[in-house]
Amino acid sequence: MNSKNICINVGMNADVSEFDQIEIIKAAGFDGVFFDWERTVDRKREITKAINLGLELQSFHAPFYGMDDIFHADDTLSDKMLNDIIGTIDCASEYGSDLIICHAIIGMDNHSPNDLGIRRLEKVIEYAEKKKIRIAFENTEGIEYLQKILDAYGELPQIGFCFDSGHELCYNCAEDTLAKFGKYLFSTHLNDNMGQTGDEITFYDDSHLLPFDHGVADWNEIAERLHKYNFDGPLTFELVCKNRPQRNVSDKYEKMTFEEYIAEAYKKADMFRKIYNKQ
């Protein structure tokens, strides 16, 4: 149970191109990366560069713009989203990653998962099994959807949970989502924020701050909880180096060069790794 590798997302809303980010990420000391998958964006150059530099392809992140369509829209819109998940599975298979990440839902007002959505998801779950790809669903807003999906499919070997520490704080009202879903744990998206700062849950609070910085997460407690569920995969961080709209909590990052930001990200990620490995 010794998580030695630390991984990070490519992108981060940075001004530096994804192609140029990869070498900087490698030079900082990270062991791997994950990429977003988008039907209209060809990342072959970036992915190939990461492979050639010896970076692990930890996962590919499926689009999430239409996850609510799977549960609440007609077949045309639902199929569009399902086909994008299938596209993400194909990309992972092509480049040798065995994991994709999906949101369970999108939309702060969605709280009514249904059997229709569960039946529709069967298409991608069967395809993932055929391609030998695992799918980890995140704790996002509308945690009822994650519960419904894992109740239906969580015992399948290709279906699991991606723990997002930031979402837990600002979307899930700091509820212990690992206590609910830890037995399904496949992956992490580790980041911090200021919690829910107003009366309503909002995307603007999902700041993706560095650990051990100025967010509200208790990183020792997070390490303890991950250990409780025997997590031994790479410690994967999902970070953003720009402010969300109407927020200024990332001002200090915006003043850094990308090289400075990634060096600081690695320093903080390594701090967490050392705490985790001492558990």
Per-region residue spans from a language model:
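N-terminal pre-domain/capping segments
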Residues: 1-87, 93, 129, 183, ...
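Hydrophobic faces of well-ordered beta-strands that scaffold small-molecule active sites
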Residues: 4-10, 33-35, 57-62, 100-102, ...
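Acidic-and-aromatic substrate-binding clefts and catalytic sites of carbohydrate-active enzymes
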Residues: 11-18, 32-45, 69-70, 107-112, ...
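Short helix-capping segments at alpha-helix termini
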Residues: 52-55, 127-133, 153-158, 228-231, ...
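Surface-exposed, active-site-proximal loop segments in enzymatic domains
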Residues: 64-83, 106-116, 201-210, 245-256
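Active-site acidic/histidine proton-transfer and metal-coordination neighborhood
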Residues: 71-160, 260
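Acidic/histidine-rich catalytic cores of soluble enzymes
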Residues: 122-216
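A short, acidic, amphipathic alpha-helical segment used as a generic capping/interface helix at domain edges
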Residues: 214-228
